[in-house]
């Protein structure tokens, strides 16, 4: 369930941030901001649902999922294919996030 929350949170955060990007950098209508802010609220709520006793650990583990989702967004929404350096960097981050998320604790 944790991965589901992280993935949904990443999509909500990226969509929310992209709405600001679209308004500011792509000169889209300010109406883009309303669903963006709702999306950012959804992001925060979803991340708070992660089952952990330390917020910082949840955020650190989330980072790897966020990077992978950002590269998927880059490719699927923006039409820019990630290069080998993007993919290598994402692999390192996902490995680190997995270590944080799956490490045996309390031993």
Swiss-Prot record:
The chain crosses the membrane at residues 4-24, 30-50, 60-80, 87-107. Keywords: Cell inner membrane, Cell membrane, Membrane, Transmembrane, Transmembrane helix. The keyword Cell inner membrane applies. The keyword Chaperone does not apply. Pfam families: UPF0060. Its main location: membrane. One of its GO terms (cellular component) is plasma membrane. It is found in: Cell inner membrane. It is a multi-pass membrane protein. Belongs to the UPF0060 family. This is UPF0060 membrane protein mll7841. It comes from Mesorhizobium japonicum (strain LMG 29417 / CECT 9101 / MAFF 303099) (Mesorhizobium loti (strain MAFF 303099)).
């Amino acid at each position: 369930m944790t991965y589901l929350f992280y993935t949904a949170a990443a999509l909500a955060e990226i969509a929310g941030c992209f709405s600001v990007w679209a308004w500011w950098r792509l000169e889209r209508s300010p109406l883009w901001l309303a669903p963006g802010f709702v999306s950012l609220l959804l992001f925060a709520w979803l991340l708070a649902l992660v089952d952990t006793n330390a917020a910082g650990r949840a955020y650190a583990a989330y980072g790897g999922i966020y990077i992978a989702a950002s590269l998927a967004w880059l490719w699927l929404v923006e039409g820019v294919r990630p290069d080998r350096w993007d993919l290598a960097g994402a692999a390192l981050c996902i490995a680190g996030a997995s270590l944080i998320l799956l490490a045996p604790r309390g031993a």
